[in-house]
């Protein structure tokens, strides 16, 4: 097999358009710019893109045109490439690197471009100025083909009760973590600020960050007029920022093809380990303070091929944990066995709240940044993790300038996914009725920084009873009740759950 089937990343491109107006770059403009930056980084001509055999676009939150892969292929002269759209999920970019590295190793692909972008800041400005959607539609001959099935990451019942709101779900995970750790509300809140103040240190030094501003732990943790609560305990500064104009692109090929294209060996970045897992449905999980799918992902990224078998988390000099919310970072840190006081930075970009999270495509920016980081620090290793939905889909990759020894391979993800799938779901009901106990919760806030709605995940019975059915319910917006929920640890509190006309309700005793 050798060089012909050894996958390498050879070119990366990133664009952040902080200065913008109604006539600024569209989503496809940003993707095209990033693609050409990746070409420039690889040291090859734009005409080389005509030789792509595959082109994959990571879906934007709101697709700006009928078929973005076809439009981008037409723009860059890659019309012979097979064109795909990667559906929703922040795991997408790392999944693509993992999947197409395997395709290259198997001789099924030779030269691939991945790209993605969001221009939500510009789009929002256009809507405010004109009252119309951005005029970004471009001619396409057909609808896009999805690389994998585009499935909902929450059920209709879960969505009705607010679990489609990412801040709300991750805040519920955060409260479960706080309770499990035995922290007080005040202690844990400051800890969230301390976690993310280090992210702002990185963002402040980045030319690609949307908010290159260093903030203190207290500034991040304290709710103010400019930093309101979104979903308690999360303030605005703890939330992924998607109102941005950002893009990224990656070029993946084989060592043999790279040399045919004239790409210098010092551009080569090797994938030394990778993994992909999926979590159970939101209500079917074992708990909300940890993730079994993340645990298996962490195990497998260091174990699933010969290249990474001798590596561990202590060998990772550079890390970018997916960072949509603090619980995602802290859970990854704990899952990988890192201590709270580990001196290594947990981001190389500044993270989704401060670098900016280009929708589903953020991890393409973090991979691009990791490529640049390990090129600068030759011989080092970098770990990137990715998370889609509500801890729903996970992916990880290890990057280095060090060549992979022997043939590149990886364990079929289906083999370890089966272990996860074989664990029975926690029993749940859509129509709870009777005595119940809070398992976790959050309070959703309005733009006036006032609590609007409580959301509870609970059990009909005791928390320690594995047969106790799980449910999701709303807590009426009585201000004194909602305020109490933000001042005390309510996990383990009892109440009555019932099915209303449309929504489940929970009344605290």
Regions found by a protein language model. Name each.
Residues 1-85, 105-109, 113-256, 264-354, ...:
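Conserved "HGTGT" condensation-loop signature of ketosynthase/thiolase-family condensing enzymes
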Residues 355-363, 374, 379:
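A conserved active-site cap/scaffold subdomain adjacent to cofactor or substrate pockets
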């Amino acid at each position: 097999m050798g060089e012909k089937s050894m996958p390498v990343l050879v070119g990366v491109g990133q664009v952040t358009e902080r200065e913008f107006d109604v006539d600024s770059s569209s989503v496809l403009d940003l993707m095209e710019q990033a693609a050409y930056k990746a070409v420039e980084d690889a040291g090859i001509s734009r005409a080389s893109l005509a030789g792509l055999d595959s082109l994959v676009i990571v879906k934007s939150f709101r697709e700006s045109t009928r078929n973005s892969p076809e439009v981008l292929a037409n723009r860059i002269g890659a019309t012979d490439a097979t064109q795909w759209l990667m559906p929703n999920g922040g795991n997408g970019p790392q999944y693509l690197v993992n999947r197409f590295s395997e395709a290259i190793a198997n001789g099924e692909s030779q030269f691939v471009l991945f790209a993605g972008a969001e221009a939500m800041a510009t789009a929002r400005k256009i809507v405010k100025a004109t009252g119309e959607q951005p005029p970004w539609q471009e001619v396409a001959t057909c609808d896009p083909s999805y690389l994998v099935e585009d499935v909902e990451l929450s059920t209709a019942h879960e969505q009705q009760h607010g679990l489609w709101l990412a801040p709300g779900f991750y805040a519920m995970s955060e409260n479960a973590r706080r309770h499990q750790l035995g922290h007080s509300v005040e202690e844990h809140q400051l800890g969230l600020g301390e976690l993310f103040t280090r992210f702002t240190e990185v963002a402040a030094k980045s030319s690609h960050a949307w908010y290159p501003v260093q903030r203190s732990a207290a500034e991040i943790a304290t709710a103010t007029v400019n930093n309101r609560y979104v979903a308690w305990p999360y303030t605005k500064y703890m939330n992924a920022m998607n109102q941005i104009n950002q893009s990224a692109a990656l070029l993946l090929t084989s060592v043999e093809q790279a040399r045919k294209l004239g790409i210098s060996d010092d551009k080569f970045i090797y994938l030394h380990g990778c993994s992909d897992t999926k979590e159970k449905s939101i209500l079917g999980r074992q708990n909300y303070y940890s993730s079994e799918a993340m645990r298996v992902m962490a195990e497998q990224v260091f174990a699933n091929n010969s290249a990474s078998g001798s590596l561990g988390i202590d060998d990772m000099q550079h890390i970018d944990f997916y960072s949509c919310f603090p619980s995602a970072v802290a859970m990854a840190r704990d899952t990988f066995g890192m201590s709270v006081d580990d001196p290594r930075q947990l981001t190389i970009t500044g993270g989704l709240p401060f670098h900016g999270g280009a929708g589903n495509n953020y991890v393409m920016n973090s991979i691009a940044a990791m490529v640049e980081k390990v090129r600068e620090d030759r011989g080092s290793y970098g770990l990137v993790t990715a998370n889609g939905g509500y801890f729903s889909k996970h992916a990880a990759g290890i990057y280095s300038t060090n060549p992979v020894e022997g043939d590149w391979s990886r364990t079929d993800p289906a083999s370890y996914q089966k272990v996860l799938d074989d664990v029975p779901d926690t029993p749940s009901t859509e129509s709870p009725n009777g005595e119940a106990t809070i398992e976790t919760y959050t309070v959703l806030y309005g733009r006036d920084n006032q609590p609007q709605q409580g959301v509870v995940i609970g059990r009909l019975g005791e928390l320690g009873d594995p047969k106790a059915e799980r449910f999701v319910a709303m807590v009426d917006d009585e201000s004194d009740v909602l305020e109490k929920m933000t001042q005390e640890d309510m996990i383990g509190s009892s109440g009555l759950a019932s099915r209303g006309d449309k929504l489940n309700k929970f009344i605290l005793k």
